[in-house]
C-alpha cells in the first residue's frame, strides 16, 4: 500500500503544481518510487501518452520530476474549457463529451469509481503518491460531491498540506480563513501550512506565523521563497502571459481566448536572447521577428475573435515580411477554409486566413498519437527546418487536406494522405499539427539562427540546449529550494498509507 500526502491551496495559482513536483523530486532523490496524482484537472494544455491517451500537462511535468513515464491514471479526469460555460470532458484519456458546467457538476459523482480505479493502479507502482488538489477546498458552492480536494482526501485518507500565496497579499487571511471554512473533520486532515512565493526577510513574518499557528492550531511547515523556475506549470500562467521583457529576438504568440498547448514555446523561453510575448491586441503585436499561432480549443471561435479585433489582418500583413507559424488549431486557421458539419465547435463553414493551401473539416473523433521523425522538405525562409528531428504528438479534432492539386510538400512519407508534418507556402508561412516539434531544440535553433542572421546579431548557442536537459536541472533546483525552506522531517512524518472509505 502506497503512502500518500496531498497538497491543497487557498486559491488557484497558489503554487500547488510546483510544490507537488518538488516533493516528487525529493522523494525520488531519497530513493522512493513516487508518482503524482490529480483526480480532476481543468487545463488548456494537454499531453498524449504512449498509449494515445490524453492527460493534463501539469501531471506530465510532475511525472518527469518523479523520473517516471506519464500515465493517464495520474490524471483520470481532464476538463478542457471550450467556452465560458462548458468544457470537453475527458475520462481516462478519452473524450466523453462536451458538457455545460451545471451538467458536469451533477454528473461528476458518477466518476468516483474511475478515480478510485486510477489511484489503485498507481499504487501498484508507487511507494509514495503526492496528490494535488484544485483551486480551494473552501469553495462553498463546489463542496457538494467534491472529488478533487477534501472529498478526495477523505476518499484515500490523505494528510493535507495547505498552501497560501503571499505574493498576491493577504496570506494570513487566506490560510486562516480557509481553515475556518472547513469542517472539523476536514480541518483535522490539515497537518501543515506553507507560505509560498515569499520575497524578503522571513523574520518579519514571525508575528503573523505565531498568530496563525495559535488561532489555526496547525503548524507552519515552511516559508518558501519566490522561485524563478521555468517549468510547465499551470499555476504560473498569469505571470507568464504578462511577462514583457526585451530580448534581441522577439517572438509573438497570439493569445486568443481559447489558447491551448502553448507549452510548445517553452524551449524559446529558456533562451536568454529571446523574448516570448503573448499578445491579444494589434497594439501589443507591434513588429516581432516571428509570429506563432498556437493551438486552440475553439479554432473557429478564436479565428473569428482574431478577425474582429484586427489581429488576422495584422498577421496577414506581417506574413509578407516575417515568418508566421501555426501549430494545430493555428495551423487550421492559416488554411483556406474550416468546415464544421457536425457542430463540434461553432457549426457551419468559415473562411480561413488563406495563407496555406489547406481545407479543414472538424470531426467528433479526436486524433491522439505520439509521433517522431524528421521534418520533411520545406521551402521558404525557414527551409533549414528540412530534416530536423522531432519528437512530439498530435491532438486535434478534424482532418486537413490540400485545397488544390498542389505538390504535397511536407507530407510525411508514411501518412501521405494527412498533412501531419510541416508544410509551407514556399515563402514565409508554415504550419504543422505536431505539438512539441521544437522541444528537441534542433528546430528551435534553426528559427533563432535564421532571425539572428537576418538581424545581423550573434546568439549564444550554448543557451540553446536540449529542453529535456534544461528541465532536469530545473527540477533539481526546485528540490534543492524545497529542502532548504520546508521542514522535510515534518513532511515525512505526515506520510501515511492510503485507505479507502
UniProtKB/Swiss-Prot annotation:
The entry's keywords: Cobalamin biosynthesis, Glutamine amidotransferase
Keyword Transport (UniProt): no
One Gene Ontology term from the biological process aspect of the record: cobalamin biosynthetic process
Record GO terms (molecular function): ABC-type vitamin B12 transporter activity; catalytic activity
Pathway(s) per entry: Cofactor biosynthesis; adenosylcobalamin biosynthesis
Annotated NCBIfam families: cobQ, PRK00784.1
Purpose of the protein: Catalyzes amidations at positions B, D, E, and G on adenosylcobyrinic A,C-diamide. NH(2) groups are provided by glutamine, and one molecule of ATP is hydrogenolyzed for each amidation.
HAMAP family per the UniProt record, alphabetical: CobQ
Official protein name in the record: Cobyric acid synthase
Name of the encoding gene: cobQ
Amino acid at each position: 500500500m502506497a503512502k500518500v500526502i496531498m497538497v491543497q491551496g487557498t486559491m488557484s495559482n497558489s503554487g500547488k503544481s510546483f510544490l507537488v513536483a518538488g516533493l516528487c523530486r525529493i522523494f525520488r532523490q531519497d530513493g522512493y518510487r513516487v508518482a503524482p496524482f490529480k483526480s480532476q484537472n481543468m487545463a488548456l494544455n494537454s499531453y498524449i501518452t504512449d498509449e494515445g491517451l490524453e492527460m493534463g500537462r501539469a501531471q506530465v511535468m510532475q511525472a518527469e520530476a518523479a523520473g517516471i513515464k506519464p500515465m493517464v491514471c495520474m490524471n483520470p479526469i481532464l476538463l478542457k474549457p471550450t467556452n465560458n460555460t462548458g468544457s470537453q470532458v475527458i475520462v481516462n484519456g478519452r473524450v466523453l463529451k462536451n458538457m455545460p458546467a451545471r451538467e458536469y457538476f451533477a454528473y461528476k459523482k458518477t466518476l468516483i469509481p474511475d478515480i478510485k480505479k486510477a489511484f489503485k493502479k498507481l499504487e501498484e507502482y508507487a511507494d509514495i503518491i503526492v496528490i494535488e488538489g484544485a483551486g480551494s477546498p473552501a469553495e462553498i458552492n463546489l463542496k457538494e460531491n467534491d472529488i478533487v480536494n477534501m472529498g478526495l482526501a477523505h476518499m484515500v485518507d490523505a494528510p493535507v498540506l495547505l498552501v497560501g500565496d503571499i505574493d498576491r497579499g493577504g496570506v494570513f487571511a487566506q490560510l486562516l480563513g480557509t481553515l475556518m471554512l472547513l469542517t472539523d473533520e476536514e480541518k483535522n486532515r490539515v497537518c501543515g501550512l506553507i507560505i509560498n512565493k515569499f520575497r524578503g526577510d522571513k523574520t518579519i513574518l514571525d508575528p503573523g506565523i505565531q498568530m496563525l499557528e495559535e488561532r489555526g492550531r496547525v503548524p507552519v511547515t515552511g516559508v518558501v521563497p519566490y522561485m524563478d523556475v521555468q517549468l510547465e506549470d499551470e499555476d504560473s500562467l498569469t505571470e507568464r502571459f504578462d511577462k514583457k521583457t526585451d530580448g534581441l529576438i522577439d517572438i509573438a504568440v497570439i493569445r486568443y481566448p481559447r489558447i491551448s498547448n502553448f507549452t510548445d514555446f517553452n524551449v524559446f523561453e529558456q533562451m536568454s536572447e529571446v523574448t516570448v510575448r503573448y499578445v491579444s491586441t494589434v497594439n501589443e503585436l507591434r513588429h516581432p521577428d516571428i509570429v506563432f499561432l498556437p493551438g486552440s480549443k475553439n479554432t473557429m471561435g478564436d479565428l473569428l475573435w482574431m478577425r474582429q479585433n484586427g489581429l488576422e489582418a495584422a498577421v496577414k500583413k506581417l506574413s509578407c515580411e516575417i515568418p508566421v507559424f501555426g501549430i494545430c488549431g493555428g495551423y487550421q486557421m492559416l488554411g483556406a477554409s474550416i468546415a464544421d458539419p457536425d457542430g463540434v465547435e461553432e457549426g457551419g463553414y468559415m473562411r480561413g486566413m488563406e495563407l496555406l493551401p489547406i481545407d479543414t473539416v472538424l470531426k467528433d473523433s479526436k486524433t491522439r498519437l505520439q509521433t517522431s521523425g524528421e521534418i520533411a522538405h520545406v521551402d521558404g525562409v525557414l527551409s533549414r527546418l528540412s530534416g530536423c528531428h522531432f519528437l512530439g504528438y498530435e491532438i486535434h479534432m478534424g482532418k486537413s487536406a490540400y485545397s488544390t492539386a498542389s505538390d504535397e510538400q511536407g507530407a510525411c512519407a508514411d501518412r501521405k494522405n494527412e498533412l501531419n508534418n510541416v508544410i509551407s507556402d514556399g515563402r514565409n508561412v508554415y504550419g504543422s499539427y505536431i505539438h512539441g516539434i521544437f522541444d528537441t531544440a534542433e528546430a528551435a535553433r534553426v528559427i533563432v539562427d535564421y532571425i539572428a542572421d537576418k538581424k545581423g546579431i550573434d546568439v549564444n548557442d550554448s543557451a540553446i540546449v536540449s529542453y529535456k536537459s534544461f528541465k532536469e536541472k530545473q527540477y533539481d533546483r526546485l528540490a534543492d529550494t524545497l529542502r532548504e525552506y520546508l521542514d522535510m522531517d515534518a513532511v515525512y512524518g505526515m506520510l501515511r498509507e492510503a485507505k479507502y472509505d
